[in-house]
């Protein structure tokens, strides 16, 4: 007999779990379908393990770059990769257990398997059919790969988290935040690291101050940056090393090559055609502001929609969807404007709102006023490895409403959240001026700019 649910989520990542738990809290009979581990990309091969590895890199940098000038004897140079991976795995296992406990508490049926649509109300999982009044597609995304000879010799971000040891020489190909973060982690852990970007700099969509400062730090501390670098082929050598060949004739030989050129939707194996769900030319599911697809009763959230591909965005959209469907809030939806973003690079980056070029294009040069601050991060100021910290406020109109906040430097990843609230609420430069600074911190620069 076919089992029927009020609500089914396909995909046990951040968006699916958040939405299904919220629906179950309102008394809905719910099921979550996931073929792999709970938590999706973020918990298993994304945000969480990446942050753990980033912390390890920061510890090494603290010891070797900054320790001597703080008076510490840093001659001991031992690092055990297996210990780090075991600690990371144990932490992720605890997150899995937490998810299982919450889903169990909410009486959500967790079905392990791959789901395929039979029709708009019916799914097939493990050879059995189940039906639902409402179905959420939250299948996420996966890494993209270039179409060049030898592409199979490289790994992607998923493969990085499966490495049995830290390679001595690594090439990371890509110019987005994933490439920048991975290259920073690997470089920080002590490997000879190369970052290959197609144009003049990484993170070109960020405010120019951000990308320019990042390049400055990379040139001083690594990874080695290769600009205008378009991959042509990868050759596997007799000794097992890999040679990345570029279109302009340059090449680099490494022990490990990581593709980090972007991500694509994971929508192609769930038989969307049987349900009639529309996708765009890139394979992303087309949704409106309420996360509705073109088929009544079928919804989508997260990376498979091509919206802002961040874990908190999928979580927020999923919860709001359940509020709308099951808690009598017919207009509930996520506002996708002014979403804060952090890049856990070395140093970290924080940004929310419009870049300076975007503001000038939208409002005109005469309506835009920019405030900046540039200084040496105090953490590094007493050492020979001094690192810049740069901040910017983008303001518009006579009232100087703040429409953009950007920063790069120590602590930026942790300080941005509160400032994002202020921007979302419509804060002005005067509001910032009227706020007493906390000293000595980097954050105080945002409220003391002149």
Tell me the role of every PLM-derived stretch.
Residues 2-3, 8-12, 18, 26, ...:
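Residues forming the flavin
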Residues 2-5, 12, 21-28, 33-166, ...:
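Glycine-rich flavin
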Residues 8-36, 41, 48, 52-62, ...:
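Flexible, glycine-rich terminal cap/loop adjacent to redox cofactors
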Residues 18, 22-23, 42, 135, ...:
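Hydrophobic/aromatic ligand-binding patch that stacks against planar heteroaromatic rings
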Residues 47, 139-192, 196, 224-225, ...:
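Glycine-rich dinucleotide-binding loop and its adjacent helix/turn
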Residues 109-112, 116-124, 130, 189-289, ...:
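A Rossmann-like FAD-binding core segment of flavoenzymes
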Residues 152-168, 251-328:
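FAD-site-proximal beta/loop scaffold in flavoenzymes
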């Amino acid at each position: 007999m076919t089992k029927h649910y009020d609500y089914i989520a396909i995909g046990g990542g951040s968006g699916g779990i958040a939405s299904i738990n919220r629906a179950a809290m309102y008394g809905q009979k719910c099921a979550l379908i996931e073929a792999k581990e709970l938590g999706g990309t973020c918990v298993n091969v994304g945000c969480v393990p990446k942050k753990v590895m980033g912390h390890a890199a920061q510890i090494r940098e603290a010891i070797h770059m900054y320790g001597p000038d703080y008076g510490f004897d840093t001659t001991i140079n031992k690092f055990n990769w297996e210990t780090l991976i075991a600690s990371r795995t144990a932490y992720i296992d605890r997150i899995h257990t937490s998810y299982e406990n919450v889903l169990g508490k909410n009486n959500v049926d967790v079905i392990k398997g791959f789901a395929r649509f039979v029709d708009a109300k019916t799914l097939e999982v493990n050879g059995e059919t189940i039906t639902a009044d409402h179905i959420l597609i939250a299948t996420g995304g996966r890494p993209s790969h270039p179409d060049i000879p030898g592409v199979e010799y490289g790994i992607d971000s998923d493969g990085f988290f499966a490495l049995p040891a830290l390679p001595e020489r690594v090439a990371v190909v890509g110019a987005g935040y994933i490439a920048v973060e991975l290259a920073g982690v690997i470089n920080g852990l002590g490997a000879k690291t190369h970052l290959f970007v197609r144009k003049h700099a990484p993170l070109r969509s960020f405010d120019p101050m951000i990308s320019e400062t990042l390049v400055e730090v990379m040139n001083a501390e690594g990874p080695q940056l290769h600009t205008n670098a378009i991959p042509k082929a990868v050759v596997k050598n007799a000794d097992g090393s890999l040679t990345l060949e570029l279109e302009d004739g340059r090449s680099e030989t490494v022990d490990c090559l990581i593709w980090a050129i972007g991500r694509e939707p994971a929508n192609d194996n769930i038989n969307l055609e049987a349900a009639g769900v529309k996708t765009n030319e890139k394979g992303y599911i087309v949704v409106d502001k309420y996360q509705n697809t073109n088929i009544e009763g079928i919804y989508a959230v997260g990376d498979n929609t091509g919206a802002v591909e961040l874990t908190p965005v999928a979580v927020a959209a999923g919860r709001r969807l359940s509020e709308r469907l099951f808690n009598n809030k017919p207009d509930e939806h996520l506002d996708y404007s002014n979403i804060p973003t952090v890049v856990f690079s070395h140093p970290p980056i924080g940004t929310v709102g419009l870049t300076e070029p975007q503001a000038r294009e939208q409002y005109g040069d005469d309506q835009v006023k920019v405030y900046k601050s540039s200084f040496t991060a105090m953490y590094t100021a007493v050492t020979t490895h001094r690192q810049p910290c740069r901040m910017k406020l983008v303001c518009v109109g006579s009232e100087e409403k703040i429409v953009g906040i950007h920063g790069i430097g120590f602590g930026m990843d942790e300080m941005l959240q509160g400032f994002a609230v202020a921007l979302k609420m419509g804060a002005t430069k005067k509001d910032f001026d009227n706020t007493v600074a906390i000293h000595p911190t980097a954050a105080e620069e945002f409220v003391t700019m002149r």
